[in-house]
Amino acid sequence: MEADKIEVGQTYTCESPLLKKSFKGTVEKIYDLSVLVDVHEFEDTDAKKVDDLNGRLVVPFYSVNPS
């Protein structure tokens, strides 16, 4: 997704190599090439990893999709 279309406080579907499945999260902060996402909807198989990461991930713009 293009950076100018991503908004803080909005929920998006994202992907990360750290998790096995895609997840939904709310953008907390926008960086130069990525965003900080608060993860709130994820698969049970990723629950431990999300907990280890304190429910937050930095993902690149190209891994963010509209929900």
Question: Model regions: which residues?
Answer:
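Short coil-to-beta transition motif at edge beta-strands of beta-rich domains
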Residues: 2-18
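Short, acidic/hydrophobic/Gly-rich beta-strand patch recurrent on exposed beta strands
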Residues: 36-40
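A generic structural micro-feature
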Residues: 6, 17, 29, 51-53
